[in-house]
């Protein structure tokens, strides 16, 4: 039975199934690799947004990471409690979030681990193949949800 759980799926399998399985396995590898830093894959994604932006509101973070505001609020509170994020009011209605010094150090350490996991996932691919995979995934991520084939026969 355990052999069936670890067997690779057929490349001809349903694309949605392959995406889901790949995502689950990759996320599990991230969670495992980040665990001793006190981060989950989701928390790493949140912190990584700050690599290119100094501070954001929770609503902006939620939009960027495609989660609900409520989910982001809970995540930000957890990261704040862990000493990785801090909040400061912009005005009476908006509170900005930014990484603490500890948060930036944790992000740097986590990013090294994530890159190692990525290298493992991409092992065996040529540079051209890796670039093709990354380009394809980026294009797929940008695909609108309204894209449908209307001439199905």
What are these regions (language model features)?
Residues 27, 77-138, 142:
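Charged, amphipathic alpha-helical coiled-coil/dimerization segments
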Residues 1-37, 128, 151-153:
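N-terminal leader segment of winged-helix/HTH proteins
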Residues 47, 61, 78-82:
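Basic amphipathic alpha-helical segments that dock to polyanions
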Residues 58-59, 70, 77, 95:
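Residues within helix-turn-helix
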Residues 64:
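Residues within the alpha-helical elements of helix-turn-helix
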């Amino acid at each position: 039975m355990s052999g069936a759980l670890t067997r690779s799926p057929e490349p001809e399998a349903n694309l949605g199934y392959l995406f889901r399985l790949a995502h689950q396995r990759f996320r599990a590898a991230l969670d495992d690799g980040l665990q001793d830093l006190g981060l989950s894959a989701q928390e790493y994604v949140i912190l990584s947004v700050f690599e290119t932006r100094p501070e954001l509101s929770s609503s902006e973070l939620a939009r960027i990471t495609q989660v609900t505001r409520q989910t982001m609020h809970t995540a930000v509170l957890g990261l704040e409690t862990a000493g990785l994020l801090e909040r400061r009011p912009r005005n009476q209605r908006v509170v900005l979030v930014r990484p603490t010094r500890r948060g930036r150090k944790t992000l740097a350490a986590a990013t090294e681990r994530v890159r190692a996991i990525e290298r493992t996932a991409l092992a065996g691919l040529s540079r051209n193949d890796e670039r093709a995979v990354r380009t394809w995934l980026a294009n797929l991520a940008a695909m609108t949800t309204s894209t449908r084939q209307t001439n199905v026969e």
